[in-house]
Amino acid sequence: MTAENEDDSLYAKTVKRTFYNEDGEICFEQIGDNCFLCNGKMLNQYDLLDLFFDSLDLNDKDVLLLDRAYDLKFNDVIFEKRLLCKKFCVIHSGHYFEDGQSESSIYLNFEYYYWFKYSKYIDSFIVSTENQKINLINVLSDYKYDIPKIKVIPVGAVESLCISNGRKPNSIITASRLVNEKRIDLVIRAVIEAHNSNNQITLDIYGKGDKPVEDKLRKIVKENNAESYIRFTGHQSLENVYQNYDLYISMSMFETFGLTLLEAAASGCALIGLDVPYGNATFIKEGYNGCLIDHSYNQSKDSVIELEKLVAERILKILSNKDILNKFSNNSYELANNFLLYKIEEKWKEILY
């Protein structure tokens, strides 16, 4: 049935669900959110999960992959049962946020609190970058938690490198959700500043998101008479798109991995980004395939303006020198080669078999 949240938004509320086996027989029924009828017994969600894990009969040769730690009911059952199987916990997002790094979290990420508290029962954490591994070890140590093995297996990969048949000169691309923390406004203002010195520069913005944020970004473009060289292209497949551009820019405040950074590097784009955790420093190497710019999360209005000018300077430096541009492009391909799908598959095989 349709129900209302406290903020008056609507959601689908569970009234009753019936689950069948392959023979069309009823296995169990769900009444509301936390009541289940199974073989004539009334169970809550914990009881049902407990029954499920008993039926699996896991042993020390089995592997249990845990993802999205915020579902505490799964965690309760898994750790209280002291299952014999190996337990690998995949950390997809940031585990710790300094003041200003995230709009929704500060310090230890509540999503992973349970895992960290019971880390002595975990065989391995899996993170996407070496930088996050180092930081996670430090955070667990600071909070006096046990430190299990920590494996680095990137959450993203590319099947192949995308070789360009020709890039539009002076072209820039950025791609992300249009939300505040991606700081597309910085990208736009930096491009406007750079365009004052090189009127051949163009920027295409791929992605959709919060309408108020998009409206604000479009207003910046319009107020600066930049509609002729800054375009909003919406959400679309970026396959065979990156390689048409010279330069990819990300001003995101935090990237646990940064799949678009990898895709841009795999397409031979030069890269510009802020030196923030963790993906930017993984895919952008200062002077090698782009520019990694120092950043402070507690910035004054004047320092933001200086940052915009600094990014504009880096844009002009890269696009005005074909030798630098070619060097950065070749090195991006070289860096992305480490993230080919078959190489990531080998990393999984190492821990699973």
Where are the regions a protein language model picked out?
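Short alpha-helical donor nucleotide-sugar binding micro-motif in glycosyltransferases
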Residues: 235-236, 240-245, 348
